[in-house]
Amino acid sequence: DINPLGIDIGSRGIPMFELDMNRVFPGDNNGAVAESVAAGIVSDIIGSDFCLDIHSSNIFVREMPQVRLNDDNVDKLLPYAKMLNADFVWIFSSITVLDATLAYSLNHLGVPTLVAEMGVGNRINKEYSLQLLDGIFYLMIQLGIWEDEPVKVREPIISTEGEVNFLTAKESGIFVPAINSCGIIHMGDNIGDIIEPIEGRILQHIESPMDGIVFTLRENPVVYKGALLARVHGGRK
């Protein structure tokens, strides 16, 4: 464990330094504690054949097992992303990528690195974990790291940023989902409602704007105006 104090308090920051560990890469050997740790991590990983940075989501939304990469590295990384048994691969603009993350720093330094994201923050989803584990072993077999009979991995949906619709709260209130999990949805299907908690009035009725797949869904019921409720990848509008 590279951050035992953070594990104790459920944070990826080092206590007392107020620094997010995934915002200080590639680090600085002469910097603050978090920066020095980050520099040590990068030094250990440099020279590796491949790196997979595994995340849960935050505590507010649930994510379908997915792999994320920016469009600068598509040619090099997309073949790896397809091996990881994810449901979804999201290719987004490099303009939106933070250059102080582990994945950005390692890719910049020549180590092929992908980010896998799934589930909800501070929670372990066994089904999602086993799904990704199959993908990791499949990738290692393809890279010659592991010898075994490869399992069959699923073919992920490949999406670019322009194909993703963000559904946000227009009012503050309590979000009550109408669907239990991420998955296939049709245009006009009910995703959920925002309820006024005192009177029980429906403040906002949220429907899918397209046929497609919900790959992000609000988990925390308390929402404020502008909060993310769902992300939908789709075709027909």
Segments predicted by a language model, with ranges:
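Structured catalytic-domain cores with a bias toward divalent-metal coordination
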Residues: D1-K237
